[in-house]
């Protein structure tokens, strides 16, 4: 039995009646505000900005080498992308300290524990999830985030960072942005693994819209959304000026049109979208990568190991991997 059948109700259905008003009520928690932004107000924009955030992490050779080690981005890019998106979506749709949120964070931490990852690298990846949606909405959203929304978005991901064990987390959004910029100036540089992972991801995103034989036409469109430092670090060609101008103008035109349309009121949950990777749903404990592709062991509260195929809702979040 699958952990999450698609189109089923979730444990967080209480979030289904989220207001789509521009500013949160004073009593709302930062998690509720972050969920509203993600699922109702800026659903498409945040999803696209987080896709672009992935590219920024590929411009760092130390990060791209780790991603290349698993081979997943090149051999099974759709699964690797879906797993990343679903793990993050579980935390924001259900809450950081919900049962599903805790299991998702534990799954993510187990994947990271297999590698020696520097704290500043982890913090940078986390910072892209905060900074890129804010920047995208400033440029292409029907409106930018309000200051209180920016702070709620920051606090949500800061809370995620704490649960990931990242040390020296910035206390303020401005400091996170400063460190994000400083990291990119220092660490962006070209590498063969940057190009490999970025190319596989770009082709994956194009496959959402185009047949493979038309990828050549779509690549300049994605490149038009990337800055020069990013293009150079990944070995991508700069798009023709007219392509960049057309893409950016189209996004700004979309933003103006959206201001005249009613806002989404029913949450769009990424965990409920049909995915060819998981046609019958998925289990949190089966998401992501594993050492030597062997299954993970979960642990009962009494300490006995069980196989992942058994019902896991009453288990502790995660146990140890089998080597």
Model region roles, listed by residue range:
Residues 1-323:
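Mature, function-bearing regions of proteins
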């Amino acid at each position: 039995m699958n952990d999450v059948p698609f189109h089923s109700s979730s444990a967080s259905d209480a979030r289904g009646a989220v207001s789509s008003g521009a500013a949160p009520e004073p009593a709302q928690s930062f998690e509720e505000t972050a969920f509203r932004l993600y699922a109702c107000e800026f659903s498409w924009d945040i999803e696209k900005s987080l896709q672009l955030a992935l590219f920024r992490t590929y411009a760092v050779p130390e990060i791209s080498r780790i991603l290349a080690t698993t081979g997943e981005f090149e051999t099974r890019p759709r699964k690797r992308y879906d797993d990343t998106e679903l793990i993050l979506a579980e935390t924001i749709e259900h809450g950081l300290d919900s049962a599903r949120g805790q299991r998702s964070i534990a799954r993510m931490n187990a994947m990271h524990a297999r590698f020696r990852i520097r704290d500043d690298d982890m913090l940078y990846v986390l910072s892209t999830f905060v900074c890129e949606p804010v920047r995208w909405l400033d440029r292409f959203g029907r409106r930018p985030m309000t200051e209180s929304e920016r702070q709620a978005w920051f606090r949500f991901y800061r809370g995620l960072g704490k649960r990931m064990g990242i040390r020296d987390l910035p206390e303020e959004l401005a400091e996170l942005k400063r460190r994000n910029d400083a990291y990119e100036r220092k660490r962006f540089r070209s590498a063969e693994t940057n190009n490999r992972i970025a190319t596989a991801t770009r082709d994956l995103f194009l496959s959402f819209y185009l047949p493979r034989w038309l990828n050549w036409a779509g690549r300049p469109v994605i490149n038009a959304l990337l800055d020069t430092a990013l293009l150079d670090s990944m070995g991508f060609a700069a798009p023709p000026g007219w392509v960049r101008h057309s893409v950016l103008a189209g996004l700004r035109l979309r933003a103006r049109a959206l201001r005249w349309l009613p806002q989404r009121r029913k949450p769009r949950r990424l965990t409920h979208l049909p995915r060819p990777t998981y046609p019958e749903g998925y289990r949190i404990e089966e998401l992501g990568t594993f050492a030597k592709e062997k299954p993970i062991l979960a642990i009962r509260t009494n300490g006995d190991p069980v196989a992942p195929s058994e019902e896991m809702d009453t288990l502790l979040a995660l146990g140890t991997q089998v080597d």
